[in-house]
Amino acid sequence: MPGLQLKKRPLSRYLKDYKHGQTHCSHCHKQLDRMALVFRGQIINKEAIAGMDQPIDDQVWSKLQH
C-alpha cells in the first residue's frame, strides 16, 4: 500500500529486548547466567547500547541479526 509506514523503534530498544529475551546459549543450549552482546564484531556494554538511538524497523532488525 502506498504510504504504509513500518513502525520504527530505536536500535537500543531492539538490542535490550533481544538481550533480556535470551535464556539459553544458542550453541550448547546451556542456561545463561549472564551474557554479553557482540555487534559488528565488538562487545557492547550498556552505555554503548544506550547511544544506539537510530530508528529502525523490524525488517532492518531482522537483517542485523543474520
Curated annotation (Swiss-Prot):
Reported function: May regulate sigma factor activity.
Protein name: Protein FliZ
Organism: Yersinia enterocolitica
Lineage: Bacteria, Pseudomonadati, Pseudomonadota, Gammaproteobacteria, Enterobacterales
Recorded name of the encoding gene: fliZ
